[in-house]
Amino acid sequence: MTDSADVSVSSPVDPPARNVPWLRVGSWVVFAVVVVMLPQQLASAEVNRLSEVMYVAVAALGLALLTGYNGQISLGHGAFLGLGAYVTMILTVDYGTSYAVAGLVAVIAAFVLGVVVGLPALRITGIYLALVTLALATLFPQIAIRFGDITGGSVGRGLLPRDGYGDSALIEEIGRRRFLRTQGFRAPDWTGLADDQWRYYVFLVIAVLVFLLVRNLVNSRVGRGLVAIRDNETAAEVAGVEVSRYKVVTFGLSASLAAIGGWMFAVLNNAVSPTSFTIALSITLLVAAVLGGAGSIIGPIIGSLIIVGVREVVPEDSQRYTQVIFGAVLILVMIVAPGGIMGVYRQLKGRLARARATRRAPSATT
């Protein structure tokens, strides 16, 4: 009787279930087509806004990996993003390096700094770790101002080489390479694309690669180890997880992803300044991750869309209030819906599934 009931319960669900994979694939195909075609249909300002969503999402994904999957709280990821942006501007403008090389150096530098900052995580957790990273976010703009000869000080850096850079012979040596860098991130002639469209597609490729990297990582044995550490560090260590190495390397990897977001920031804005990388940016990234759902991969992308969208609709003279709004939203979400939007979605999905199963149960038993 029980076996037949089990069969009869599952059989009504089977026909639509067979269509789900095709529906899912079709949805992703439509989504991909829309994403690829958007730059052709939108104005330049709107394309740049979508590019902003992508660099915020990349940095928020790195933060979600650290906070949502590994349980380490960081209020300093704005500093890692700023490091990536400054390294990119300095290397490309002053030394004529390619954007690719500058990005690689930025990622390595952020990884090293992330590992150094992550070392205290071996001893402290929770609010105390958050305070350590908060100190980093607070210090970063001051450090940028202090080393003004390199960073441009409180004014920041743009596409022009820093004042007094080198003599005429050195400028001639760098020559054409540096001149090209001072033109910004331009679309190659063979693409036939406007600069904003080319930038969008490059950002899209980077965002997709980062998304796939994080997805594969969290679904691997390493990802299961990260979650085990988050849930119970002692039990994870007993189970054979190398807790110290996992925590430090995760911090470094998370910082590297934020630095990629910083590279994208520099490419998009063609300028950096200390005021762009204050504690407010770190809070914004944390809100993007937590609001969408730091324990999911899609969540930070949703959160980034909302964050950038809110900035877009808030009047220019009221932008200073957005950080207050984001802070309030962060507190509210952590109290009411710790899993963020994706957490609420999963709960509703589970309730609907249980409700459907309950409705089918009486007919199945008859």
Set out the residue ranges of the language-model regions.
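Transmembrane alpha-helices and adjacent helix-loop boundaries
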Residues: 2-366
